[in-house]
Amino acid sequence: MSSSPLSKKRRVSGPDPKPGSNCSSAQSVLSEVSSVPTNGMAKNGSEADIDESLYSRQLYVLGHEAMKMLQTSSVLVSGLRGLGVEIAKNIILGGVKAVTLHDQGTTQWADLSSQFYLREEDIGKNRAEVSQPRLAELNSYVPVTAYTGPLVEDFLSGFQVVVLTNSPLEEQLRVGEFCHSRGIKLVVADTRGLFGQLFCDFGEEMVLTDSNGEQPLSAMVSMVTKDNPGVVTCLDEARHGFETGDFVSFSEVQGMVQLNGCQPIEIKVLGPYTFSICDTSNFSDYIRGGIVSQVKVPKKISFKSLPASLAEPDFVMTDFAKYSRPAQLHIGFQALHQFCAQHNRPPRPRNEEDATELVTLAQAVNARSPPAVQQDNVDEDLIRKLAYVAAGDLAPINAFIGGLAAQEVMKACSGKFMPIMQWLYFDALECLPEDKEALTEDKCLPRQNRYDGQVAVFGSDLQEKLGKQKYFLVGAGAIGCELLKNFAMIGLGCGEGGEVVVTDMDTIEKSNLNRQFLFRPWDVTKLKSDTAAAAVRQMNPYIQVTSHQNRVGPDTERIYDDDFFQNLDGVANALDNVDARMYMDRRCVYYRKPLLESGTLGTKGNVQVVIPFLTESYSSSQDPPEKSIPICTLKNFPNAIEHTLQWARDEFEGLFKQPAENVNQYLTDSKFVERTLRLAGTQPLEVLEAVQRSLVLQRPQTWGDCVTWACHHWHTQYCNNIRQLLHNFPPDQLTSSGAPFWSGPKRCPHPLTFDVNNTLHLDYVMAAANLFAQTYGLTGSQDRAAVASLLQSVQVPEFTPKSGVKIHVSDQELQSANASVDDSRLEELKATLPSPDKLPGFKMYPIDFEKDDDSNFHMDFIVAASNLRAENYDISPADRHKSKLIAGKIIPAIATTTAAVVGLVCLELYKVVQGHQQLDSYKNGFLNLALPFFGFSEPLAAPRHQYYNQEWTLWDRFEVQGLQPNGEEMTLKQFLDYFKTEHKLEITMLSQGVSMLYSFFMPAAKLKERLDQPMTEIVSRVSKRKLGRHVRALVLELCCNDESGEDVEVPYVRYTIR
């Protein structure tokens, strides 16, 4: 991932870590920053416990320490128009100590274009007072108050962070000077039509604890030289990922023990597997082993005050294609403030007189600017466009700038992530009509309605067009909620004939409330789509939104059929998995509909726009597959907590889900055994043995039996299996080359001894016994003392390691072994399984893993099982929070990123609705608010292919009418002849989905039978599925040869049958 120059780490180093060591360290920095009050935050604030069930996903972004800092920070948000309410919403969801809303203005029609907590009946009322109760509902932990007085110094002194939005420059300078002198953090945010501005001043001594938010890296050491400087070589399994200037610490190094536990050492990267540290020439010889871990060292950064930075600005780039624009807009915004101060209003939309005056003012500002700011020439065209749109107020721009500003507030409170240093300018001029003559002053005049702020930028024609749009929103989670809010604000589907259809089959959970801002605590367990639809109707009563609860996929194509898609103007994805995204992408390509795609991961986000006949599709490029953990690593040779957590998840499935499912199938499906025996490798043996254990060998009758089973299973996994492994591979075992077997990624384990007084051991038994009981419909117990008492009487069989037990060292060995099956053992199992007739009414209860319910023992089992195995292998354990992240495959999320990303999505929506045809009008985007980094690029054009002289892309296809003029359907022979005659293509293979309909190597008898059959009849017979009445056309894939016999790539066929 590329990053901006401003994301480069500021490097610091210090004196020796301890007497006699040659390694420089971060010790001086640690002591230096510890003397500075942490970011000036109030230390006497309430240290309330963090509600992990509410802040779960955000905690994985910020961490507990940063979250505690947020909870001690009071924030003032001044200005409650669209931008101010967006910032307030995000920081209230984030969980700061308290928020005060300040505004002395009253609600106007133009405010309703983007201020989602103002309604038509609020016109004439104070914006802060009206917004306060609606914002207060977002988070019961955050007191929200309204203030309508002046921003006097005594009032400002009560806050740790002050946010000014849509504030005059004179007020910004006055408040900025005061805040800088008092150590109060300041964020200034402003939006003007399609332009946005952000400024940060977090004082002269801000302590930054983590500049990027990434998990500290670690690597296994294979060699350290005795040299000045010493060179560390890591195992070549994976690149170490460190950067020059990073600090690292060492552990488990054998031989060169001076490295173990030393203070963090600054490194210089030499290559992907090597880096230098310090003078190691006087250290002991390196023997083997060791883990090197990155250490996040706090650092101090300094900000200039607003007046000083105004004269000598530093910019964060938002678009490298507009490299000179920030400096121009720095002048332009100062000129705009001057214009507003002189006229008590912004320039009138599309008014040439006002635009000319703003250009003149900008030239005067430039002329008197200091050398650091002064430009050779003022970009008159840019300043004119600023004048044309400055009266506008757009929800998507406010969402983007508001998301960024709220993240900066969180940085100011916590010291987590690199702040914006110090100015950021943004514009989305590509949203304006491609026809530069399309907009006039008359078209942009206010209409005294809720869209005036948007009409000022785009005119009334686009507003009418937006109202008529029919859009399909797939998902009503975090991105879905933000999209619905923006749709309501911009008027999408709010006019005659317009509609937004939203589908989501999920219900609301408490952990959703932290970022899915349309939901409230009293909505928990309700359907997301219904609740979100009702919430946005409050924001704009004119939005015509229909809510569904359907999963998108082949099963719902009778609902989302040809008629449904053909009536749509576009689709917006708000999905959380790649499979569903790719499915929707295929549907959009087939129906030739625009697709707005986006996603977030913590502080990272991306936006992709897919335009028919213009861009590639979402599926045209794919991320590389996630690296999987080798099975033998999981089974026998774990070396990281991720390995033990995955092992624990597999244990959960293999103990509490799969056996119960297999037993139920065995008891109800007479062909289960026959089908199981056809499985590959050792699977038949494993499945039938599990069924035998569940029904015969380990079937419990009482709660006490479940406790006994859990205790026995504990001994099997954490003692007996480890002893067997060490019997096969003793600690001093050597490989065939004479190297130690237990070295590098292989950590030598040790067996554990069960101790009922060990909390972790009892945790395991409690969770395992309760889950085991649940699978049999038995009642469990949460009485730890009673379980401990039961364990005293459990007899554990003596275990002796066996000779001849094969333990596979590599996955290749395992695959070879899987090829052979013990047929006699299978026959024995079939004979000993009880007949289903002898177990009438018996069934088991499979357990689906649910990570977010802390009372169901699921995570209790995972944490205990993983940490016990980690103890076996001397791997550092993981707490419940980290375990839930890894085992539950949780996607970290925070409201700020979602707001910013959806703002960008809706800027693309403006272009789609206008029908922009130039590729460079559209922008795919990537951002990382932690760095901060912003990257925009033109979408890639759809790749072009050719057969003969015919060019085609993924948007093209052959259209074949299946019904002939005589009313009969085309046969396979007629279909093949049609392509030979019409397109000079010889079809060599023809398929529909996974069904092969025709191939050149098909047996002659089968071919003869099919040639005269109608196409749909062949499809139904081969797929063994009857075509539904909703199916009007089939997608057929072809392999073809041209007239010279060469294989050619051709588009798919849309074969119409109705």
UniProtKB/Swiss-Prot annotation:
The modification Phosphotyrosine is found at Y55. ISGylated. Its EC number is 6.2.1.45. The modification Phosphothreonine is found at T800. CDD domains: Ube1_repeat1 (cd01491), Ube1_repeat2 (cd01490). It is found in: Cytoplasm; Mitochondrion; Nucleus. This is Ubiquitin-like modifier-activating enzyme 1. It comes from Rattus norvegicus.
